[in-house]
């Protein structure tokens, strides 16, 4: 799959809302309302067209094209919402998208390649980076400047907590 056609997860339909087919969306964009600026797709690349939306607390409540009953909205629960990677805005050199870190090399302070980033998770308390070391061992670390002091397109430098 080319980078032009690669899908990036930017939100999820978390639940139905009300009785008229509205849904609540959890956005992974910053700010959350930015999700409304994109043409959203499901994993099959079907377009999810939003008619209208309002922000309530931490949820985005949406009316989706052709969804007019609660039963129809319930069927969309847990639908992941994607955009094409090339739709993301270009960032300054000092910034990066967390999703772009997946699979890049991990180096120690001496510059030796000691593993790679295997996964990035967010449990609402901040991003967690899973590193797979060259020996196969997997360890999860909080994504902080202290633990990951250098980040480039090609690698990150790690200072594991026992060394801080």
From Swiss-Prot:
Localization (cell): Cytoplasm
Domain PRC barrel: 92-164
Gene Ontology annotations for the cellular component aspect, listed alphabetically: cytoplasm; ribosome
Disulphide linkage map: none
Keyword rRNA processing assigned: yes
One biological process term in Gene Ontology: rRNA processing
Keywords linked to the UniProt accession: Chaperone, Cytoplasm, Ribosome biogenesis, rRNA processing
Signal peptide coordinates: none
GO molecular function terms listed in the Swiss-Prot or TrEMBL record: ribosome binding
Protein's job: An accessory protein needed during the final step in the assembly of 30S ribosomal subunit, possibly for assembly of the head region. Essential for efficient processing of 16S rRNA. May be needed both before and after RbfA during the maturation of 16S rRNA. It has affinity for free ribosomal 30S subunits but not for 70S ribosomes.
Recorded domain comment: The PRC barrel domain binds ribosomal protein uS19.
Subunit structure and binding partners: Binds ribosomal protein uS19.
UniProt cross-references to NCBIfam families, sorted A to Z: 16S_RimM (TIGR02273)
Family that this chain belongs to: Belongs to the RimM family.
Name by which UniProt lists this protein: Ribosome maturation factor RimM
Organism: Orientia tsutsugamushi (strain Ikeda) (Rickettsia tsutsugamushi)
Underlying gene: rimM
């Amino acid at each position: 799959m080319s980078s032009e056609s690669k899908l990036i997860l930017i939100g999820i339909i978390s639940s139905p809302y009300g009785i008229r087919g509205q849904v609540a969306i959890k956005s992974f964009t910053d700010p959350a309302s930015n999700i409304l600026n994109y043409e959203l797709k499901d994993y099959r690349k079907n377009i999810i067209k939003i008619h209208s939306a309002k922000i309530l607390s931490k949820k985005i409540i949406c009316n989706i094209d052709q969804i007019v009953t609660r039963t129809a909205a319930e069927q969309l629960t847990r639908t992941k919402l994607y955009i094409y990677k090339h739709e993301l805005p270009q960032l300054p050199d000092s910034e990066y998208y967390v999703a772009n870190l997946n699979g890049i090399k991990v180096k120690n302070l001496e510059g030796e390649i000691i593993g790679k980033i295997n996964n990035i998770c967010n449990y609402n308390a901040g991003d967690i980076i899973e590193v797979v070391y060259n020996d196969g061992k997997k360890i999860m670390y909080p994504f902080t400047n202290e633990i990951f002091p250098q980040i480039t397109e090609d690698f990150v430098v790690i200072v594991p907590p026992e060394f801080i």
